[in-house]
Amino acid sequence: VIRTWRFAIGFCLAALCLAACQPSPTQAQPGAVLFQDDFSRTLSGWDRHRETAYWVDYQDGTYHMRINAPNADAVSNPGLDFKDVRVQVEAAKVDGPDNNLFGIVCRYQDPGDFYFFAVSSDGYAGIGVSKSGRRHLLSHETLLPSPRILSGNATNVLRADCVGYELTLYVNGNVVNQAQAAEWDKGDVGLMVGSYEQGGVEIAFDNLSVTQP
């Protein structure tokens, strides 16, 4: 079973990064922690925004992103700048349909340009790129099912490796997708949530870490 990629004709609600001064790209020893957040502090740098179509905010020691509109997505960033990174986060559906999308962003340039590593609560996964606001997959022509993804409201540990031209998505310690891309060699990291025909998608993220590959 495959799923047609429909975000290519969707729209981005917002990219929610801070406008604060950003540091230069960091190059550290392999395994070094570049950034981490358990979302226990509401001033750790992530956006806090609420409107009818979507909202993003800290809640109960986690970071929640909710998309009320159909066929839409939102990205949130801490306002950093890295070259090669390994980003890991715990993610669980709180509300909405299993036919959703959520995951990790790397090499974020602006609201329309970044790489994303996405899974759904009904067990699909893919790696893609957003260029000038248009999204398409890099890993395959469509999102593909993976038995490594825990369905429904279960917590999944997602990991995205952005190393040189190589992009790799891990779910619960297992490689589920790989792709190559050469648009950008540095940028911000972030989190992403999206909806298809039905809105009301809410995802809780926790224990995010960014390390040197």
Where are each of the predicted segments found?
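Flexible glycan-contacting loops in extracellular carbohydrate-active proteins
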Residues: 179-206
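C-terminal motif of bacterial Sec signal peptides marking the signal peptidase cleavage site
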Residues: 18-20
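Short carbohydrate-recognition loop motifs
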Residues: 54-73
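Extracellular carbohydrate-recognition regions
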Residues: 27-50
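Extracellular beta-strand elements of beta-rich domains used
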Residues: 39, 206-210
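Localized edge beta-strand/strand-to-loop motifs within extracellular or lumenal beta-rich domains
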Residues: 154-168
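Short, aromatic/His-centered strand-loop micro-motif at the edge of beta-sheets
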Residues: 133-157
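Secretory/extracellular carbohydrate-interaction modules
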Residues: 67-132
